[in-house]
Each structure stands twice: as C-alpha cells, then as structure tokens.
Amino acid sequence: MDNETKATTFSKSTGLPRKRFYRARAHSNPLSDSHFPIPISPAHVDYSLHFPKFVEADNKFIKKVEFADIGCGFGGLLISLATLFPDTLMIGMELRDKVTEYVKERILALRRTSSEGQYENISVVRTNSMKYIPNYFEKGQLSKMFFLFPDPHFKEKNHRRRVISTHLLDEYAYVLRAGGIIYTITDVEELGEWMKSCLEKHPMFESLTQEELVSDPVVELLCSATEEGQKVARNGGQTFRAVFRRIAYVS
C-alpha cells in the first residue's frame, strides 16, 4: 500500500483503517474454491509471521494458538479478547479477502498505537474454515472456538453450507481439547435452534450450566464485542445463544 492510498484509507485521528474502504459481500459461498495458500498440515503453518513477538532468538515458536474465531468478520471479538487474555494466542479465520485485509490492517494499526505492547497475541488468516480446520490445528490444540452470527443459509438446499453441522462438529471436536468451549450466537431463531440441536445430538459436547455461563467473562462479549451483535442490539433484536463444552470421552 503506497503512502497516498494509506493516508486515504486510514483515519488521521485514530490511525485505524476505515471500514468503508474494505466493504465486501455479507457472506461468501463456503463450498466454492477460492484461491489462497493452504498449509498441508499444522506443522506447515508459519505462525511466526502472525505473532512475531512470540518467537525466540532461535526462531522457535514458544506458544500455540488456543482460540479460533471462525468467520471473524471485522475482528471485533478478537480485539476485545486480546486484552482479556493477553497471554493467549488467538486467530480469526475469514473467507472474504477484503474483510481479511481490513482485520489485518486493524490489528497492525492497534499494535503500532498501543503503548503497552498489546494486540501482539491476535492475528487473522484468509481461509475456508469449513474445509481446512485440520490443516491449521493439531488434535486437542484449541480451548475455545467462536461461531458468531454465521450465515444462516435459509434455503433448505443450502443447509449443507452452514458452519455448524453434525459432520463439522466431528472436526471441531478433534481440534478442541477436553473441556474446550464452543460459543455460538445468532439473531436468526431457526438457525439458533439448528446449532443448539446439532450440539445437543453430538456425543462429544455437553451444554454449559446457567451458573457456568454467568461466570464466563467471554459470554457477554458474544454480542457486545462484535459489529453484527451491536447492530442487532441497536435494532432491538433478539439473539439465540448456545455454548457447549467438549467432553473428555463418550461413556
């Protein structure tokens, strides 16, 4: 990005990228073949490019990613989680190229303007998480996965495109450690029931109790931290949440 373009697309007052220059379609077809690099295994992901502050002198990466925000949108949740869990590495996964570029520039700008070395623990990658989750994460690597306001794919013939389904939960259970949490939320009641039903039927997940939900500081961010959640709140809309734990074994 040349200096003239950068001056236009970045706010002079905050130093952050202006969202209107990164507009894209609300959703993309997750079953289409997009063109972006795909690692052949988690060992082939160079996370040092995403988290340079967590690389030792001998180029050894000292931490592993633990949180994944699937379909991270404009990165609102990542930004909030970064300061809540400053020692935890987390990555957003987004299919839309312009949105991914915006989140990347937003994170880099926050790193530059932060006086306390914050936001070094978050990053974003453009990928199709419905196809390539096992290419990025090892078995039991993640402790939290987020699916916030995903595309509802209203038509029945398109339900196979939904990011929560029985067969995809098999993959999510693989990369989540025992005790790991899946967070889902939507403003579409039918989709909320769908996601909850898929999780309830899957043998590797159990619902959190009301007491656990109240004590989890992440739960209140599901709406307040995301741009989509804020829009729903402004319009007085309802949200439908399902939060489930990955169990250790099936009895």
UniProtKB/Swiss-Prot annotation:
S-adenosyl-L-methionine binds at G71, E94, L95, N128, S129, L148, T226, E227, E228. It is found in: Nucleus. The active site is at D151. GO terms for cellular component: nucleus. SUPFAM superfamilies: S-adenosyl-L-methionine-dependent methyltransferases. It is an enzyme of class 2 (transferase). One of its GO terms (molecular function) is tRNA (guanine(46)-N7)-methyltransferase activity. Its EC number is 2.1.1.33. Keywords: Methyltransferase, Nucleus, RNA-binding, S-adenosyl-L-methionine, Transferase, tRNA processing, tRNA-binding. The keyword Plastid does not apply. Its main location: nucleus. It holds the Pfam family Methyltransf_4. It catalyses: guanosine(46) in tRNA + S-adenosyl-L-methionine = N(7)-methylguanosine(46) in tRNA + S-adenosyl-L-homocysteine. Pathway: tRNA modification; N(7)-methylguanine-tRNA biosynthesis. InterPro entries: SAM-dependent_MTases_sf (IPR029063), Trm8_euk (IPR025763), tRNA_(Gua-N-7)_MeTrfase_Trmb (IPR003358). GO terms for biological process: tRNA modification. Belongs to the class I-like SAM-binding methyltransferase superfamily. TrmB family. Catalyzes the formation of N(7)-methylguanine at position 46 (m7G46) in tRNA. This is tRNA (guanine-N(7)-)-methyltransferase. It comes from Arabidopsis thaliana (Mouse-ear cress).
